[in-house]
Amino acid sequence: MKRNKELLLSELNSLPGLSSFKKELECIVDVFIANEKKAGSGKKSDKFLRLVFSGNPGTGKSTAARILGGIYGELGVLSKGRFVEINRSDLVSEYSALTSAKIREAVSKAKGGVLFIDEASSLSENKTEAAHGAIDTLLALMRDNQNDLLVILADYPDKMKEFLNSNASLASCFHVIAFNDDNF
């Protein structure tokens, strides 16, 4: 099916600001459209199914994530239009086993759509076994569901940089998109 890039991006382009994100997303859409033409179906790229939205509050990260999920759905990259937004309190318990169960539940709800983890750096704040377990479980579930799950981690730039640097596996598997204060 031929994809009309302008139509796919129309909702995003109607928003004020987000200029750097719009340029980045246009490139991502080009990659998926080119892969679709080459392979006959929207070939998926892990690089664009694991994203970090780094920016201050009010820069449009949550809004952009919702729109991106819709675009990925239209491209056939994701099978459903689900958008699940969670934060640390939804995931981490004082017990590792309960933390793993909460993360599995969140991924299960989001499968086929977007799992948006706001203030993601707080997953590693207290350096407990449960916090480390949360990250390890999330990484394992991302691998297991890599073809039908968009995971977006969001946070302040300085906190996100520290978070990604705290775990080599995190840093290597996420593509970072910066949201500037002048976006709105």
Model-derived regions: residue spans:
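Conserved nucleotide-binding/hydrolysis micro-motifs of P-loop NTPases
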Residues: 59, 90-92, 121-123, 156-161, ...
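Short glycine-rich substrate-engagement loop in P-loop NTPases that contacts/grips substrate
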Residues: 80-110
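Flexible beta-alpha connector loops of hexameric P-loop NTPases
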Residues: 88-98, 122-132, 177-178
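Substrate-engagement module of ASCE P-loop NTPases
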Residues: 107-109, 134-149
